[in-house]
Regions:
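C-terminal helical "tail/cap" subdomain of flavin- and related membrane-associated enzymes
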Residues: 301-438
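Conserved Rossmann-like nucleotide-cofactor binding loop
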Residues: 14, 37, 156
Length: 438
């Protein structure tokens, strides 16, 4: 039997980063993962990481010469469905190899005193005499006692889905709750792709990769990989991309649904993809998850002081900080985007043209949005159906933001808050509800 203060299930970006923060708080931390160290997170290779995140999360900036580093770029374009209107956003981005970036994070965790065990799969929770979570058992038969168990296992959410507690939702992340990501690594015939360009209507993009004469053509879609391929076909038939030769494909998944209303209960916390913490406009998860982890480390350390047990009351501040901050903004954005995509290509072009929902960094918010939309309907440039969809989504978005900003400061008021939140999200719907051609 092993004894630790904290055991984390999952050694990818969320679990490894959080383990380092906890170890720096003088906690004894073990991270387990079902994969071998050599095969960890090798499903996807290239990823993009916003450069301001290095300083925000106190990570040493990757640079030329580092094994994980590929290149930098500093402009992201987005284009309308009919390819008529371009928006420009200035974002400094690093292109990197994900497995090697995680290796870099793991090195820092080891230096901080974290212990890793690979090729170990979660089997079940163990409980103390007061029926409180008190560690885990692995499928190899290993017993690990720990006062706090953290689920960082990704979409399978192997620990969270086994918990029966009023402060923890145990839903499974199903086909309607995630984006299936299809990535084509291509060799370009003539042109070069040095910046990222996305077409939000198709949930498609073309972006830099590790080969200078190559690119990544990608799409994300709910329901299935087969439907993602159908969306890729539609994307490539609708948008004139540079001529290319396909080198190989990668596939993966990212959560795309609202996160649990609570991330903690007695002796337990959920983070990363297991908590559905991704950016609503592009599905990226690394910085979104770390925003939750960063303040949580000190709260956990305080709860574990003097051999204490981390009750839901002691961990509750983790919920409050996140849900009133990034949680409120992402929830509102997610609800708004459901309405913004539920329209035709022509409607999407109109929104781009008038800087409604989609705008460049140097464009101001359209001060006459309602007037512009109504005029568009009258002139048959924008459909009445799209107006109703967008207006309804904006109203629902504002209600959800307001509700999250009123997140309860203690577990005592959670049940009432959750009940209203469930009603608001039922009215908002999901991105998968908008699919009509599956």
């Amino acid at each position: 039997m092993l004894n630790f203060d904290v055991v984390i299930v999952g050694a990818c970006t969320a679990g490894t980063y959080f383990s380092t923060l906890l170890a720096k708080e003088n906690l004894k931390v073990l991270v387990i993962d079902k994969d071998t160290e050599e095969n960890l997170c090798k499903r996807l290779d290239i990823f993009h990481f916003t450069k301001d995140s290095y300083a925000q999360f106190n990570i040493e900036e990757s640079k030329e010469g580092d094994e994980e580093f590929v290149r930098d770029f500093n402009i992201c374009y987005s284009k309308s469905a009919l390819d008529n209107h371009l928006k420009t956003n200035y974002i400094d981005v690093s292109v990197m190899h994900l497995p090697l970036f995680i290796k870099k994070l793991r090195k820092k965790a080891l230096e901080a005193g974290v212990t890793f065990k690979f090729n170990e799969s979660f089997d079940s929770l163990i409980y103390n005499e007061d029926n409180q979570i008190n560690g885990i058992k692995t499928k190899s038969g290993l017993t690990i006692k720990a006062r706090l168990v953290v689920d960082a296992s990704g979409i399978p959410s192997v620990v969270r889905t086994t918990i029966n507690n009023p402060y923890m939702e145990n839903f499974k992340i199903g086909p309607k709750d995630m984006f299936y990501v299809l990535l084509k690594y291509v060799e370009l015939k003539d042109s070069k792709v040095e910046l990222s360009t996305s077409w939000p209507y198709y949930k498609g993009w073309i972006a830099p990769q590790h080969n200078s004469n190559g690119a990544i053509v990608g799409v994300g879609a709910n329901l299935s990989l087969e439907y993602a391929r159908k969306c890729m076909d539609k994307f490539e038939k609708s948008i004139k991309l540079p001529e290319y030769t396909l080198s190989y494909e990668e596939t993966g998944c990212t959560p795309y649904r609202r996160p649990p209303f609570s991330f903690v209960c007695d002796g337990f916390m959920v983070i990363g993809d297991a908590a559905c913490l991704t950016k609503p406009w592009n599905g990226e998860g690394i910085p979104a998850a770390w925003v939750q982890c960063t303040p949580a480390a000190k709260i956990v350390a305080k709860a574990l002081e003097n051999n204490g047990y981390p009750t839901v009351d002691l961990l509750w501040k983790i919920n409050e900080i996140y849900q009133k901050g990034e949680g409120a903004e992402y929830a509102a954005t997610r609800a708004m985007l459901i309405g913004a995509v539920n329209m035709s290509e022509k409607d999407n072009d109109f929104l781009f043209k008038h800087a409604i929902v989609f705008k460049s960094d140097d464009e101001l918010e359209n001060p006459h949005m309602i007037k512009t939309l109504l005029k568009g309907v009258l002139k048959k440039k924008f459909s009445l159906k799209a107006l109703i969809s967008l207006s309804s989504a904006l109203i629902k978005s504002n209600k959800i933001r307001k509700h999250y900003l009123n997140y309860p400061s203690s577990p005592n008021l959670y049940k009432k808050w959750k009940k209203k939140a469930e009603v608001l999200w039922k009215k908002a719907g999901t991105m998968a509800d908008c699919i009509k051609d599956a």
